[in-house]
């Protein structure tokens, strides 16, 4: 019987959870769920100078916001240093690793010689078979692995296929530094083994590490997990992803008004697809996702595609759920604080009532917030340039003409107001747009908004008529 699947996401807490890391976490999470297994979380915090508690908190917060839950407690790699040291010393006892007393000066000479000979710098193995009794006084040794010197190391990768590395290129690399701290290469192997990780899904920039890590697995006689090295994300222009392309933290996407479900849907399709399906539920992703279907080629990040997908999710969202998502993100978005401060019971009710019209036109929560500002605007309204041009003499004359009919309206509903304005259009011979445009400008201060009858209904009779009268003068 095969072992249950255990994946892991292992970020370094030296900054935010960037978009590439978020996709790696998503792929690990989906594969674990698809296989009925677990996804574990390990914080690779051995770089004590650059690792911060704030970065760890940001990573956990980003994963939680994306809806990517992990099994058990997050594990600190730094706290496992004694175990890493124990395994390194066990490898020495097994004859699979050795103490190296080469001085910094000797290592510098090796590098210089390699440079002169035009080859990559390599440790020359001078302590590989020497007796430690010959060690110079006062030199604290490192521990180096005895890497195989002939043949190849094979990495069997579910995405990249079989990848072979000449052993002559692998070097007797360090697994324990002279101060007793483990190298990244060693700590990762020990942790993955001890945590029972069966599948490693990570960026293909780790592919060369996989060969060296395989050497450690083999030396300890441990099973090598199934490797899947996924392609990196590039910008829309094919260049390596940078901040101008979208290499931002997950928190930045939240502040830009994207919904977590939409971002998940977008990220899953960066390097993986299921036929022509663009929009898929989380349940469908879990059912369909398999690492063997991940593409080898780099995926391209496209903000327009992300916005389009986010718009689909917003239009499909329940009004109250979307309202709650907007309220939660207001402190983080431009102009959001002013809305939050003005949000009393009456305006909360108006905002929720406006949601059907607002979400039809907005691609992000930021656009949604911006479109909702007419609810919070103080009278007399400030007009933008287009609205001011609509409220010229002709526009104000239209308002003056339609105002009595609106004042006489019985019910103040979208349907009845639609009927009032259409009847007025027929009576005066004006096209509906000729009435709706100055009405919209007087009610919102803008030339674009949700449907004008929705706006009239949301604002209510008293506020709507007051705003129209303000512009008639």
UniProtKB/Swiss-Prot annotation:
Catalytic activity of the protein: tRNA(Glu) + L-glutamate + ATP = L-glutamyl-tRNA(Glu) + AMP + diphosphate
Gene Ontology molecular function: ATP binding; glutamate-tRNA ligase activity; tRNA binding; zinc ion binding
Motif, 'KMSKS' region: chain positions: 240-244
Domain of life: Bacteria
Locus of motif 'HIGH' region: 11-21
Alphabetized UniProt keyword annotations: Aminoacyl-tRNA synthetase, ATP-binding, Cytoplasm, Ligase, Nucleotide-binding, Protein biosynthesis
Enzyme class: ligase
Compositionally biased intervals (Basic and acidic residues): 114-133
One Pfam family cited in the UniProt record for this chain: Anticodon_2
PROSITE patterns associated with the record: AA_TRNA_LIGASE_I (PS00178)
Cellular compartments annotated: Cytoplasm
Gene3D superfamilies: 1.10.10.350, HUPs
Subunit structure: Monomer.
Task of the protein: Catalyzes the attachment of glutamate to tRNA(Glu) in a two-step reaction: glutamate is first activated by ATP to form Glu-AMP and then transferred to the acceptor end of tRNA(Glu).
Name under which the protein is recorded: Glutamate--tRNA ligase 1
Gene: gltX1
